[in-house]
């Protein structure tokens, strides 16, 4: 329970850091925040390594380092996304963001594998390597990356203390909250997030309890028997493989269609996949449902970030990307409710409720794009006057 509380506390700090990171990326520049974040992560990893070394074993210092690393990761993220939006033409952003999405997913697959092999017996050297790589990254960013942020215009006034500066930041984010298009984008993202967050929550519980040991395929008298834990690993690996191989291809395909249609259809496919999970306990059925699920994920993998950069004013991209990441944070906070719900209502009803949330997100996307298109038409009309 203490570990859970500490993780929640760390997550709360990360939310604040993410919002501040977006603000500072706009104010001080993308490059500066990326360099500082990488260097801070590197130093934190080195201290983490020392706290997990043969000479010192301190869980308290390890947790502090873990929290600091999470904080600066949250600061790095909006700055890096805003930099991509600064340098890439609007028509190419979906493809570029898709490449980043692919590389991130490959890292998510490789990272736990390396951790599984080295963390237990070679923890010090693993953390030391992570620290040195982050410091190397900060040097590379400092020397070879150019600043891309537009000049920051701060209102003229008296010099602010840190409390006044914090108040100014909150007021800046109030402007974003008043952007109804963006607000609906976050709301729809939180609802659709209840589907893909179940990969780590409801789905493994469902597979463990409902999927019996069965033959995946057989040749003559020989057959490959798969247990429930192996079945979950198999469909999770399928998702990772599909994402790693087909993200760029699917993103290019989706760029031929209107963003509105892509978002809406993706939500409906998510709903279909979730319902299919609840209707089968066969491994092949689960694999087909996961294929649909993965396709729904890939449909919006690149265009989500591209859409954020489209609706965000050029001088506020850092803040918009930071605020947009809250849809994942809120999703993580709400999604675990599916576990007690499965005990109260059963798996079938729980999956159905999640599917309904996905359908509601499709409706919100429809309203959002209708409003966004009207807003664009009004702006064009004003320019023509």
Task: Name every feature range the model reports, one short phrase each.
Residues 44, 57-75, 285-299:
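Hydrophobic core of transmembrane alpha-helices in multi-pass small-molecule transporters
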Residues 138-157, 367-381:
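Helix-loop junctions on the cytosolic side of multi-pass membrane transporters
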Residues 148-186, 382-385:
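Juxtamembrane intracellular "pre-TM" segments in multi-pass secondary transporters
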Residues 39-56, 268-281:
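C-terminal ends and interior cores of transmembrane alpha-helices
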Residues 16-53:
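Conserved MFS/SLC helix-loop-helix module at the cytosolic interface between two early adjacent transmembrane helices
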Residues 66-104:
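Cytoplasmic helix-loop-helix junction between adjacent transmembrane helices
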Residues 17-30, 245-259:
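Helix-to-loop junctions at the C-terminal end of transmembrane segments
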Residues 11-19, 108-109, 240-248, 332-336:
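Residue-level signature of mid-helix packing/kink "hotspots" within the transmembrane helices
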